[in-house]
Amino acid sequence: MNALVPLLVLTPLFGAALTLTAGRRRRMQIAIASLSMVVSLGVAVALLLAVQTTGQPLVMQVGGWAAPFGISLVVDRLSALMVVITSIVLLAVMVFSIGQGNVDHADEDTEEETPVSIFYPTYLVLAAGVYNAFIAGDLFNLYVGFEILLVASFVLITLGGTVTRIRAGVTYIIVSLVSSVLFLIAIAMIFAATGTVNMATISARVGVLPSEVQLVLHLMLLVGFAIKAALFPLSFWLPDSYPSAPAPVTAVFAGLLTKVGVYAILRTESLIFAANDISVLLMVVAIATMLVGIFGAVAQAGIRRMLSFTLISHIGYMIFGIALGTESGWSATVYYIMHHILVQATLFLVTGLIERVAGTSTITHLGGMLKRAPTVAVLFFIPMLNLGGIPPFSGFLGKVALFIAGAEGTGLAVPQWLVWVGIAAGAITSLLTLYALIRVWNLGFWRELDEVGDVESPLTIVLEEEPDADIVRDERNNSKLMNFATGGLVAVTVALTVFAGPLFTIADQAGENLRDSGAYIQTVTNEEGIKP
């Protein structure tokens, strides 16, 4: 079963190479890309089942090289869950993009947002980068995964070559390069101090370093990952970068790319620097991220920008769980990451559907969507309740699990009073998230079209143009394939609620593995034949 581990990365890379050879032959590119993602999903599910059955991580040493020069690929419960959820989102978004391309391709007057000769190869490279980051067993391979993401995401965010997208791409690439440089410097410092970049081996060796050295290394990694995860105050770039990209690209970015940063923080805090605690700093950052993000969201008139700010705010929930430093906190974080990847990606896809029906996603210019596009209304309503934390959806279950983990007060890495502040911030964030989303529903869906133009609030920030009144739009602007892909993701988000019991069991097991990383360290070091 270990032989399947590298297939997660190799399958999309091989698919990307084949799609390039297909040139502009649309159907061939679609067939190759779709097959690659289906195979990747199958491999991810097989790896999760294998890890669940054996209870032990799967390890592959690429090329047979031992540490510190070898490339370690490791799949434990946490990474297995991440790659399964990732595969579901990537496949659904690809189906959405195919449907969008089919509609645009059939209309000679419409320029495709996802040009076939560029989109599918780059999309598969992006998938390979995400997979590589989730299963990397050493810091340098994690860095390589980040760089693959950086190159592919820059191409995707600038598709179409508009001024807005180029400007967003420049902002994104500059910030990402700063993050990558900090990460690379941290890797060099860790290698100089420990003689390895393998995370399992670092975990065993870092404890003998002076506490000041450990703190510097810890903070260097944290800052690099915090930029990628969009933690306050390093989240300024996200609302200006993500909204400008095509809907499928934005959905993947919002659902997955920031979670790679969160995953790296969780892995760092649980494995590498478990004994060097900076949880108080993390908790303060989590609280600030939740509140600043959601206050930004309620001031937006554009749905894309509003969702970008809610994305930032809900990253705060995950950092809150990590900062608790307990098994229950980490377990709840794992479940919430799964929930947020799916729901956030779904909402951005629905926003893409709204734009194609109404010609805009600015709520001050929207109206009558419930009558014009009832399917889109349903597809928006369910994830709206989910992200807002309405019971019994997974958003509610995940938040409650995080709050209970903090309220337990057992073995916390932060003062109890600070945890209560975090819980209060989380409750406020949940209420304001629901307010922001209900505002979209009331103005965009419930309000009649002839009422559009009323000014709702002087605090509203409008950064989008009015729709072209000469274009007649309705639900036929969306293909059935686009609705099917979005509906599939909505169904999976509902499944997180229906099967919450078994999923929480797996999340609890993942949290237990994170708290007691001995099995991870032993499996990796034994596989390499090295001494910790």
Give, region by region, the residue ranges found by the protein language model.
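Hydrophobic transmembrane alpha-helices and their helix-loop junctions in integral membrane proteins
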Residues: 92-102, 106, 125-140, 153-394, ...
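Peri-membrane helix termini and adjoining interfacial loops of integral membrane proteins
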Residues: 52-65, 192-203, 357-358, 400, ...
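C-terminal TM-helix exit segments that contain a strictly Trp-centered aromatic cap at the helix terminus
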Residues: 42-54, 184-191, 390-391, 496, ...
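Transmembrane helix-loop-helix hairpins at membrane boundaries of multipass inner-membrane proteins
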Residues: 2-4, 18-121, 200-204, 509, ...
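N-terminal signal-anchor/start-transfer transmembrane helix
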Residues: 7-26, 223, 230
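Alpha-helical transmembrane segments and their helix-start/interface "positive-inside/aromatic belt" motifs
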Residues: 27-38, 167-177, 373-379, 480-488
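Interfacial loop/helix-cap signal at membrane boundaries in integral membrane proteins
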Residues: 57-77, 409, 413-417, 523-527, ...
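Cytoplasmic/organellar membrane-interface segments at the starts of transmembrane helices
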Residues: 363-364, 370-377, 437-532
